[in-house]
UniProtKB/Swiss-Prot annotation:
S-S bonds: 85-159
Bilayer topology term: Multi-pass membrane protein
Transmembrane domains' residue ranges: 17-37, 48-68, 94-114, 129-149, 176-196, 295-315, 322-342
PROSITE patterns: G_PROTEIN_RECEP_F1_2 (PS50262), G_PROTEIN_RECEP_F2_4 (PS50261)
UniProt keyword annotations, A-Z: Cell membrane, Coiled coil, Disulfide bond, G-protein coupled receptor, Membrane, Receptor, Transducer, Transmembrane, Transmembrane helix
Organism (species): Arthrobotrys oligospora (strain ATCC 24927 / CBS 115.81 / DSM 1491)
GO biological process terms on file: adenylate cyclase-activating G protein-coupled receptor signaling pathway; cell surface receptor signaling pathway
Protein's name in the database: Ascaroside receptor GPR3
GO molecular function, one term: G protein-coupled receptor activity
Phenotype of the disrupted gene, per the record: Decreases cAMP levels following exposure to C.elegans. Decreases trap formation following exposure to C.elegans ascarosides ascr#3 and ascr#7.
Ranges of the Extracellular topological domain: 1-16, 69-93, 150-175, 316-321
Subcellular location: Cell membrane
């Protein structure tokens, strides 16, 4: 028996799925168009994000078509639409699995890129097509496996695996395993970034202290004898901007003449350097916190996205399909459809896509955005370089956000 089988419930769930699919379509197109129209969004990592965006778009369209049919009065689970429902369920399983593979692939390749040059990384960079092919192969295997053993049916707004038990063990639990794996990977990514920053800061601090310890070089000048008339400052020199230097020079002289030795202001230089370092350390701590938030946002977004649907599914499995209201079921369906919309935020607004669109629409804001790029670029600023590596801290120091 299909869940919420009455006509009103089916149309209500279809409307929820339709609204969510439209938002996901917009989010997916936002990422795809950003890749083709924004030069800063064409790095190697953005090529991987493009693959994820394409899968998000196809999944959103696969939600959009059946939900629109149901809203307009067509019954996708009727006997004459059995083929349509089976195709819709097969594609649903295909793209859900494909997005899972894309998520963990992007996380693993990001970690690999931050770990330094390697033959594997070199091969991946030269064979992006293989990275694109891998999620399709894995998801096709999963979809055909499900198609061979289980039936697809209307689950409320779209077709998917008909059995809740199968959906729970074949889709929900593996997705949570992937979320946990991604969490561990991005924690490792954050530790690599933090370690590289510390190494760069240590080298910079060492160079700064070495320059502070260097003995000041005296500058010896001989001031000629002067008379009181020479201490008068010419007004023309003041108006031309040379008055202050003339004033200092004339006052430094003496009526008897002497050898003047001027040392570098070591104490003032050290105070200035300490203030600059304190400000720089505070800014770096702020940037590190932003990177930490960004690292946790990747897996956390999907954990939030799948938390309620998983809880609802567990309750329904435990109670034989009952136990939640139509509104809770609608919320769970909405979150399932939100993949493209969430990815647009996590991989778009969270990185440099939003700033790129702003620069394209408002070129006058480009200078301000370039100043803010150090805190808004996120991990993209690191992995978009040709060969970021821990073995060259200077590169990290220049390129880290």
């Amino acid at each position: 028996m299909q869940p919420f089988g009455d006509a009103w419930s089916q149309r209500h769930l279809a409307g929820v799925v339709l609204a969510g699919s439209v938002l996901s379509i917009v989010g997916s197109l936002y990422m795809i168009l950003g890749f083709f129209f924004l030069r800063e969004c064409r790095s190697f990592r953005h090529k991987l994000i493009l693959g994820l965006a394409v899968s998000d778009l196809l999944l959103a369209l696969n939600f959009f078509i059946p939900s629109l049919s149901m809203v307009t009065g067509r019954e996708i689970s009727s006997p004459w639409n059995e083929g349509f429902c089976s195709a819709n369920g097969f594609l649903m399983q295909l793209f859900f699995a494909q997005i899972d593979v894309w998520q963990i692939s992007i996380a693993l390749i990001t970690l690999l890129m931050l770990s330094g040059p390697s033959m594997v990384l070199k091969w991946i960079r030269e064979n992006v097509w293989a990275v694109w092919l891998f999620p399709w192969l894995v998801s096709l295997i999963a979809a055909f496996f499900a198609f061979g053993f289980w039936d697809y049916a209307n689950v409320g707004g779209f077709c998917w695996l008909g059995s809740r038990n199968i959906r729970l063990y074949f889709n929900y639990i593996p997705r949570w395993i992937i979320i946990l794996v991604c969490l561990v990977i991005y924690i490792a990514v954050y530790r690599l970034i933090l370690h590289a920053r510390r190494r760069a800061n240590i080298q910079k601090t060492y160079r700064g202290r070495a320059s502070d310890r260097a003995p000041p070089q005296p500058v010896t000048t001989t001031a000629p004898a002067t008379n009181p008339e020479s201490e008068k400052v010419n007004p023309d020199e003041i108006s031309s901007g040379n008055g202050s230097s003339s004033l200092d020079t004339s006052r430094s002289g003496s009526s008897t003449g002497f050898t003047q030795t001027v040392h570098d202001p070591a104490v003032a230089g050290q105070i200035q350097t300490a203030a600059e370092r304190a400000q720089e350390e505070a800014e770096q701590q702020k940037q590190v916190r932003k990177i930490a938030i960004q690292m946790i946002s990747y897996p956390l977004a999907y954990a939030v996205l799948w938390a309620i649907p998983t809880i609802v599914m567990i309750i329904q499995v435990a109670r034989g399909g009952e136990g939640v209201s139509i509104h809770v079921e609608g919320l769970a369906k909405m979150l399932l459809v939100f993949n493209g919309f969430v990815d647009a935020h996590v991989y778009g607004f969270n990185e440099r896509t939003a700033m790129g669109w702003r620069q394209r629409i408002r070129p006058a804001a480009q200078e301000d955005d370039e100043e803010a790029a150090g805190t808004s670029g996120g991990v993209h600023e690191v992995v978009s370089r040709p060969e970021p590596t821990l073995k060259n801290p200077n590169v990290w120091q220049q390129n880290m956000v």
